[in-house]
Amino acid sequence: MSKFNRIHLVVLDSVGIGAAPDANNFVNAGVPDGASDTLGHISKTVGLNVPNMAKIGLGNIPRETPLKTVAAEINPTGYATKLEEVSLGKDTMTGHWEIMGLNITEPFDTFWNGFPEEILTKIEEFSGRKVIREANKPYSGTAVIDDFGPRQMETGELIIYTSADPVLQIAAHEDIIPLDELYRICEYARSITLERPALLGRIIARPYVGEPGNFTRTANRRDLAVSPFSPTVLDKLNEADIDTYAVGKINDIFNGAGINHDMGHNKSNSHGIDTLLKTMGLAEFEKGFSFTNLVDFDALYGHRRNAHGYRDCLHEFDERLPEIIAAMRENDLLLITADHGNDPTYAGTDHTREYIPLLAYSPAFKGNGLIPVGHFADISATVADNFGVETAMIGESFLDKLV
């Protein structure tokens, strides 16, 4: 019999809690990540007021320097620790795949200076359309269509851009480049980015409509991902007929592998929380695992190095945390964590190599305290242990620490 009937894992995308031991092996604009500290620097520079996460034990997580504005609780309501990444990457897919039990020894490729000419030329030759070279760099998805949408409407050229993650995105106005053509081009791009020097996690079709100054991305987005190279704990759960629910971009990250209920993309963190609450309230969800990603911290504020916005986003999540707790059933377990760092006060615009926090709460808890510092995959090992399935490649369960 499972200790917890349901486990809800919520990933606060990029909410790191201090430089990892190997952080100096990773760089941002030429600066090693060794001094990065997403939560620490936000707390220090703009203040951080997250009483509900603090109540569970956020301020109790061991650090060289305590979080300046998040005090340790004498009697927290849950358990807390920080976890280290072992995989050779600091991107979204690597972080999530490791959380689910994989060790990624060959990281995906990211393109901070845009894609090589060879890739763009192949896409041009296949599609018969030119590529707007000025867009070929990490770009905000809304900004890139504002900047180059008018030109695309005039010329029919392709808008190809990337981000901090190993993705190639193609934006196309639906009245200029029909959806079936866009999807066909994306499928070709997928076929040429499956190995080095361009091993990409996802190709994303980004259709939009509207007029210059008033463009809107549509729901016709399509993701062409790669599946994890080895079974994850999601697959193990699925094989055991244990329900798995994905909220936000989780289904895309795993290419649907091991997920039997995709609850859809999030329009915002708030919308994602609404979807999680709806999922938790499903009468048929009596036993199983929900996996939620809230990406606004990373996409809207981390990469844009906006510490005030990042702080406010954390406040907004913390204000809604009581709703999540109220939706829990007696034998539910809530795990709150991250997938990498993205220090909004740091050099560059890339993710930062950091520990991730882990907060654990259940109405059934009799105890509280610290869990020993571990690794990302310990989360999936704990989920597997709870439901009586095999672990994946790596991870040590801390289930017996939760009492």
From Swiss-Prot:
It comes from the Bacteria. Mn(2+) 1 binds at D13, D339, H340. InterPro entries: Alkaline_phosphatase_core_sf, DeoB, Metalloenzyme, Phosphopentomutase_DeoB_cap_sf. Pfam families: Metalloenzyme (PF01676). Keywords: Cytoplasm, Isomerase, Manganese, Metal-binding. GO terms for biological process: 2-deoxyribose 1-phosphate catabolic process; 5-phosphoribose 1-diphosphate biosynthetic process; metabolic compound salvage; nucleotide metabolic process. It catalyses: 2-deoxy-alpha-D-ribose 1-phosphate = 2-deoxy-D-ribose 5-phosphate; alpha-D-ribose 1-phosphate = D-ribose 5-phosphate. It is found in: Cytoplasm. One of its GO terms (molecular function) is magnesium ion binding. Its EC number is 5.4.2.7. Pathway: Carbohydrate degradation; 2-deoxy-D-ribose 1-phosphate degradation; D-glyceraldehyde 3-phosphate and acetaldehyde from 2-deoxy-alpha-D-ribose 1-phosphate: step 1/2. Its main location: cytoplasm. Its cofactor is Mn(2+). Binds 2 manganese ions. Gene3D superfamilies: Alkaline Phosphatase, subunit A (3.40.720.10), Phosphopentomutase (3.30.70.1250). Mn(2+) 2 binds at D298, H303, H351. GO terms for cellular component: cytosol. Isomerase that catalyzes the conversion of deoxy-ribose 1-phosphate (dRib-1-P) and ribose 1-phosphate (Rib-1-P) to deoxy-ribose 5-phosphate (dRib-5-P) and ribose 5-phosphate (Rib-5-P), respectively. NCBIfam families: deoB, PRK05362.1. This is Phosphopentomutase. It comes from Streptococcus pneumoniae serotype 19F (strain G54).
